[in-house]
């Protein structure tokens, strides 16, 4: 049974999170650091693709940790236990940022002359939907579904978690009958529907486009994980995979710059085409050594990967607060030294908020929620067929597994 943290993928999480953060902070970068914004425009303008990378990572990580324990046969108790463990990962930070966002909207209604545009969404039904993580399920577009903007992807992730109990049964049987190479090609194929829709419409953001994004990217992550689990690469092969991951990352960046200079006339969001390279990137990082995998596996990168979910959830609150202050107090973010210092301060506040959320909310609440459930008994463990057969027979902390969240 393969479990344990793949550090390079933990490090990849912070890369994806920062990609999304910079995407949302583009207007601020344009004002305070126009040269930086212009130089990195092809990469920053498609930062929303970081969410697709998160979806693939989530499917990979859950399959990495649960394929053997949930794939052989269905167990309602094990599935419910799994879902509670998933909630313990995402719900605490999600609920805190959700309520902070709601309180901020109320604050703007009572202080100053610039009420939040989201004030009309403060309804009882909207609260219940967001509390239960189902707000996105009723909307064709994710904009405006959540008081804390990035929370839409957590609602999408929750749908994937609910489907995982059935998906893992299918993946287990496909993996049993398919070689690693076949599983890899299936994973690439599973990641294609959002790209095909993009090519058909020219837009990445269309009605209900979030649904194939989460379902198919999550499934692609699960399939490529099943492929990786079958591999036993030599040291030389691992080094080769590491070099391949570096080349893939460079290729993704190169394609983004090429598409920026030579846009496809019929595809407005042509940068979304790079999604087809995410599955190969994740797979090579998972088995690779040296170069890019080694850099992403450094302790600071792994720690930042651990707090990436909190950063993902809190950064838009900082951004929204600043936008309100600009209108309320008629502030301007200049390109001088003071403007750059203020921009760095906003980033620092977001990171500090993420650190506080991780240490004061995310980890303590996760452990508290886990303590409420007894692990499901698995007789296979008693019979000696595996040393880790129950869902929480593996100690699911930061030292032993990769976190599986869209953030």
Q: Where in this protein do the model-derived segments appear?
A:
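The cytoplasmic-loop to transmembrane-helix boundary for the fourth helix
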Residues: 182-185, 238-243
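Short, amphipathic, aromatic/basic-enriched membrane-interface segments that mark the entry/exit
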Residues: 151-154, 208, 239
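Membrane-interface helix caps and helix-loop-helix hairpins in membrane proteins
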Residues: 143-148, 199-209, 258-268
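Acidic, glycine-rich loop-and-beta core segments that form the ion-binding/anion-interacting portion
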Residues: 204-229
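Membrane-cytosol interface segments of multi-pass membrane proteins
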Residues: 1-196, 214, 295, 302, ...
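Perimembrane helix-loop-helix junctions
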Residues: 72, 230-231
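Alpha-helical transmembrane segments of multi-pass integral membrane proteins
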Residues: 48, 214, 218, 222-223, ...
């Amino acid at each position: 049974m393969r479990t344990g943290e793949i550090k390079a993928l933990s490090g990849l999480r912070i890369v994806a999170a920062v990609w999304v953060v910079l995407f949302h902070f583009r207007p601020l970068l344009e004002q305070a650091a126009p040269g930086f914004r212009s130089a990195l425009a092809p990469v920053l303008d498609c930062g929303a693709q970081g969410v697709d990378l998160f979806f693939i990572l989530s499917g990979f990580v859950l399959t990495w940790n649960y394929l053997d324990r949930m794939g052989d046969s269905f167990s309602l108790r094990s599935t419910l236990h799994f879902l509670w463990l998933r909630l313990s990962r995402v719900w605490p930070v999600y609920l805190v940022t959700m309520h902070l966002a709601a309180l901020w909207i109320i604050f703007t209604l009572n202080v100053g002359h610039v009420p939040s545009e989201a004030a009309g969404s403060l309804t009882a039904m909207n609260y219940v939907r967001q509390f239960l993580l189902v707000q996105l399920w009723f909307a064709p577009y994710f904009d405006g579904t959540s008081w804390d903007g990035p929370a839409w992807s957590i609602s999408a992730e929750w749908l994937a978690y609910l489907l995982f109990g059935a998906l893992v049964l299918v993946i287990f049987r496909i993996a049993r009958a398919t070689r690693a190479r076949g599983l890899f090609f299936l994973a690439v194929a599973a990641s294609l529907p959002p790209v095909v829709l993009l090519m058909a419409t020219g837009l990445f953001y269309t009605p209900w486009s979030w649904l194939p994004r989460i379902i198919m990217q999550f499934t692609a992550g699960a399939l490529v994980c099943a492929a990786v689990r079958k591999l036993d690469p030599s040291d030389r092969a691992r080094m080769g995979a590491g070099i391949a991951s570096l080349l893939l990352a460079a290729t993704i960046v190169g394609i983004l710059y090429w598409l920026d200079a030579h846009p496809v006339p019929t595809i407005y969001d042509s940068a979304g085409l790079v999604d087809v390279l995410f599955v190969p990137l994740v797979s090579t990082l998972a088995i690779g050594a040296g170069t890019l995998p080694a850099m992403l596996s450094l302790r600071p990168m792994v720690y930042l990967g651990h707090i990436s979910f909190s950063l993902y959830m809190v950064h838009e609150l900082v951004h929204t607060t600043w936008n309100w202050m600009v209108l309320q107090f008629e502030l301007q973010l200049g390109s001088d030294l003071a403007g750059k210092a203020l921009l760095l301060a906003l980033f620092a506040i977001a990171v500090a908020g993420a650190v506080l959320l991780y240490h004061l909310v995310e980890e303590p609440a996760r452990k508290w929620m886990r303590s409420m459930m007894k692990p499901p008994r698995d007789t296979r463990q008693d019979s000696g067929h595996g040393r880790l057969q129950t869902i929480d027979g593996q100690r699911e902390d930061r030292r032993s597994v990769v976190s599986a969240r869209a953030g």
